[in-house]
Regions:
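Short hydrophobic alpha-helices and adjacent helix-cap/hinge residues
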Residues: 1-329
């Protein structure tokens, strides 16, 4: 995908380029050896990592100069996660940033002492038993998580406003990590008087079966696309299928309508990664991770793709358009 190729170039410029340009000397080597070491564990390398590194730079942490960033990417190989998490522990990282439930669960199993900053859209850290409270997480874990019930309610609301006769909705979700999010969507749909149809996926091969099922169930009038790294990767395929099936869609990924989906309402992922860098800064400056509260994103964007709306034969109400943060013509 274009975004991933671009972000890889940016990542190399920010990290690899900085390290390559730094003169090799005993003094520089000594500085690097004494530099704070940040571990970063996530499924894919993308533009969000660039936002994280840029914010580190703003805070005075120059990767390859006075800071070491140890990045581990596990892609679809979940079985590699324990080894990758243990690598970061053995490298004596001062803090580990773990993006996605897979990543921070592996990190928590690997260490109970190194501070972990989690970034996740699919989980409830209290209900999952990872922390005791949002205000005082305790242990070695903190981070950024969504208020799923409120967000899922808004997604149903915006989809229903776009399709006033909406009464049956398909839910495309990752059944490995998305159960909490799916239950929150069920609750929101019940409150809105909408019947849900589950369209679970676990791997890339499941998407066609989910699409076929949605097409066969003629009652479905729209689809809520829940979040997971896998679903984000497949956003263009999902958007293309939805237009062919003439099904309005909404996702919490703002990249989704830019790939051809109808609607998105969700947090700015680059902002979340920038905020993770602020957590890292506070930890490296001596704050106890147990005293750093779990935080919710404060910025949410509504994005509407009018080109897709026209292809679906929909007229988006003016009341919704005026609330949009971005309209794609």
């Amino acid at each position: 995908m274009v975004e991933n190729k671009q972000s890889r170039r940016e990542f190399i410029t920010l990290i690899g380029g900085a390290a390559a340009a730094w003169p090799i000397s005993s003094r520089a080597q000594d500085l690097i050896e004494k530099a704070p070491r940040i571990g970063f564990l996530q499924r894919v390398q993308n533009e969000n990592v660039v936002a994280f590194v840029q914010e580190l730079r703003n805070l005075g942490y120059l990767v390859g100069q006075n800071t070491v960033l140890e990045t581990r990417i596990f892609e679809a190989a979940l079985d590699r996660l324990p080894d990758l998490a243990n690598e970061l522990v053995n490298l004596k990282c001062n803090v580990i940033v773990a993006a996605s439930r897979y990543a921070f669960e592996a990190a928590m199993r690997a260490t109970s002492t190194i501070p972990i900053v989690g970034i996740d859209l699919e989980s409830d850290p209290v209900a999952s038993g990872w922390i005791k409270s949002l205000a005082r997480p305790r242990g070695n874990f903190t981070g950024l998580f969504l208020d799923l019930p409120e967000l899922c309610g808004k997604e149903i609301e915006f989809l229903k406003e776009s399709v006033p006769a909406l009464s049956h909705v398909g839910v495309l979700w990752d059944s490995i990590i998305g159960e909490v999010q799916f239950r929150a969507t069920q609750t929101a749909a019940l409150a809105a008087g909408v019947t849900l149809h589950s369209l679970p996926i676990e791997n890339p091969q499941d998407f066609n079966a989910a699409f076929d099922r949605a097409s066969r169930e003629h009652l479905i009038q729209g689809v809520v696309v829940l979040s997971s790294p896998l679903i984000l990767e497949q956003r263009s395929q999902i958007a293309e299928w939805a237009v062919k099936a003439r099904l309005p869609t909404i996702s919490l990924f703002t990249l989704f309508p830019r790939a051809g989906g109808l609607l998105a309402y969700g947090p700015s992922l680059p902002d979340m990664y920038r905020h993770a860098a602020i957590y890292v800064d506070r930890i490296l400056k001596g704050s106890k991770v147990a005293d750093l509260p779990i935080e919710r994103p404060t910025r949410f964007d509504l994005v509407i793709n009018l080109k897709t709306a026209r292809a679906l034969g929909l007229e988006i109400p003016a009341t919704l358009l005026v609330r949009a943060d971005e309209v794609i013509e």
